[in-house]
């Protein structure tokens, strides 16, 4: 049996931390409201997020929105939002989502100050962040203290297995989705039982408009699927982890701080190349789609030379790392060039075009199609990538780093890298 109270005692904020968060948030709200009055703005500060809903874990963040009257132009709330954010967060940094906002720390607590429009139930949203105000109201109206702790357990569980967070880094379960799941199913264990039995797409709400792997409609916005960020891989991880937990409950499923197992690098008899770029100072939701694109371009280059990609991995830490595993570190000396079917009009032209060209053999026929075996020059993968990467865009913020791309060939004795740890330490889930 799992002692859930013991788990909660490790991760639920202490009274001292709650007092600190209240002092900081009250002070920021007071300052924001004072600035709004002095500048004649019809706006007010609102605390949102997990702290406002009482589902926060230790060392959490504070999300404070500046809710403007709905008749303000977007340029005004963007400009004023940044001005106010910088005024209340010394040394805060500007970040960009749907609206620009200010992020920083006060007293060791990470704080985001975000502008939005006021919104009531039934109002049409002006920007996507506006509905966050209603999320707080909805959750607080549907969770009691026990329910809040059930949400905390679900958050701890999803963090432990590596599927917490809707950001592009994870494509997993947002905090709001965890809250809605507990509201829908009643408890942490009921949620786990549901996922342990789920097969195929998880359609908690039936809505043919959405084709995502998981669908749960936002109760404050019927046109939004809260579960849309959940990838098929994250959903699969949740399913198998739920099955394993129910079959053998273990406190390892509630261990957020993973010490990391001792990953042993070993020779797989393949070629493992690591492509590295400098990391721009961007939010995860901006940088990760470009990292995925970078990986996709590398795979496309391999495939264009008939080099089979066995596996891949990415990591974004001090730099951007993309690992690509192939059978060998160079293209095959002979490549099969596919020609047209013999009954097409250009079949004879294809045969004649190869009469005077260097080739290993052919043209020859297999079934109804012509082929030629050609010499490739057997270039190394590194040479191929360095030459052909410039034929593709890898993202508007990464393209400028192509010339400075570093390429490393894996060997067992090389220094430890997070991308190698992830690759060699791949498991059903982190535990």
From Swiss-Prot:
It is an enzyme of class 2 (transferase). Keywords: ATP-binding, Magnesium, Metal-binding, Nucleotide-binding, Nucleotidyltransferase, RNA repair, RNA-binding, Transferase, tRNA processing. Its EC number is 2.7.7.72. It comes from the Archaea. GO terms for biological process: RNA repair; tRNA 3'-terminal CCA addition. CTP binds at residues 50, 53, 135, 155, 164. Its cofactor is Mg(2+). Disulfide bonds: none annotated. One of its GO terms (molecular function) is magnesium ion binding. It catalyses: a tRNA precursor + 2 CTP + ATP = a tRNA with a 3' CCA end + 3 diphosphate; a tRNA with a 3' CCA end + 2 CTP + ATP = a tRNA with a 3' CCACCA end + 3 diphosphate. ATP binds at residues 50, 53, 135, 155, 164. Mg(2+) binds at residues 61, 63, 112. Catalyzes the addition and repair of the essential 3'-terminal CCA sequence in tRNAs without using a nucleic acid template. Adds these three nucleotides in the order of C, C, and A to the tRNA nucleotide-73, using CTP and ATP as substrates and producing inorganic pyrophosphate. tRNA 3'-terminal CCA addition is required both for tRNA processing and repair. Also involved in tRNA surveillance by mediating tandem CCA addition to generate a CCACCA at the 3' terminus of unstable tRNAs. While stable tRNAs receive only 3'-terminal CCA, unstable tRNAs are marked with CCACCA and rapidly degraded. Homodimer. Belongs to the tRNA nucleotidyltransferase/poly(A) polymerase family. Archaeal CCA-adding enzyme subfamily. A single active site specifically recognizes both ATP and CTP and is responsible for their addition. This is CCA-adding enzyme. It comes from Thermoplasma acidophilum (strain ATCC 25905 / DSM 1728 / JCM 9062 / NBRC 15155 / AMRC-C165). The gene is cca.
């Amino acid at each position: 049996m799992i002692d859930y109270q013991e788990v909660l005692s490790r991760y639920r904020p202490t009274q001292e931390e709650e007092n600190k968060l209240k002092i900081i948030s009250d002070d920021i709200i007071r300052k924001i409201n004072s600035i709004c009055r002095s500048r004649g703005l019809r706006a007010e500060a609102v605390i949102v997020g997990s702290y406002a809903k009482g589902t926060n874990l230790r060392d959490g963040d504070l999300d404070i929105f500046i809710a403007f009257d709905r008749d303000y132009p977007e340029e005004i709330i963007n400009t004023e939002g940044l001005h106010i954010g910088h005024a209340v967060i010394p040394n805060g940094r500007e970040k960009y989502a749907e609206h620009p906002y200010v992020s920083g720390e006060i007293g060791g607590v990470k704080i985001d100050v975000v502008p939005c429009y006021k919104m009531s139930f039934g109002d049409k949203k002006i920007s996507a962040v506006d509905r966050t105000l209603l999320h707080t109201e909805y959750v607080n109206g549907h969770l009691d203290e026990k329910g809040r702790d059930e949400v905390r357990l679900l958050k701890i569980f999803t963090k432990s297995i590596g599927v917490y967070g809707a950001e592009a880094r994870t494509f997993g379960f947002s905090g709001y989705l965890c809250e809605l799941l507990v509201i829908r199913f009643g408890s942490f264990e009921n949620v786990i039982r549901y996922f342990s039995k789920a097969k195929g797409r998880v359609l908690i709400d039936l809505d043919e408009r959405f084709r995502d792997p998981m669908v749960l409609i936002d109760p404050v916005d019927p046109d939004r699927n809260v579960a849309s960020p959940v990838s098929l891989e994250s959903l699969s991880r949740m399913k198998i982890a739920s099955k394993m937990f129910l079959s053998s409950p273990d406190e390892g499923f509630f261990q957020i701080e993973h010490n990391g197992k001792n990953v042993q690098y070993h020779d797989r008899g393949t070629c493992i190349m690591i492509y590295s770029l400098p990391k721009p100072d961007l939010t995860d939701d901006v940088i990760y789609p470009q990292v995925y694109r970078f990986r996709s371009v590398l795979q496309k280059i391999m495939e264009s030379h008939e080099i089979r990609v066995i596996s891949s991995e990415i990591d974004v830490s001090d730099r951007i790392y993309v690992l690509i595993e192939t059978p060998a570190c160079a293209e095959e000396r002979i490549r099969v060039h596919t020609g047209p079917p013999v009954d097409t009009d250009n079949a004879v032209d294809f045969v004649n075009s190869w009469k005077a060209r260097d080739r290993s053999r052919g043209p020859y026929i297999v079934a109804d199609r012509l082929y030629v075996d050609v010499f490739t020059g057997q270039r190394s993968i590194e040479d191929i990538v360095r030459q052909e990467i410039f034929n593709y865009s890898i993202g508007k913020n990464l393209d400028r780093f192509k010339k400075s791309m570093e390429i490393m060939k894996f060997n067992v004795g090389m220094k430890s890298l997070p991308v190698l740890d992830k690759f060699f330490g791949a498991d059903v889930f982190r535990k």
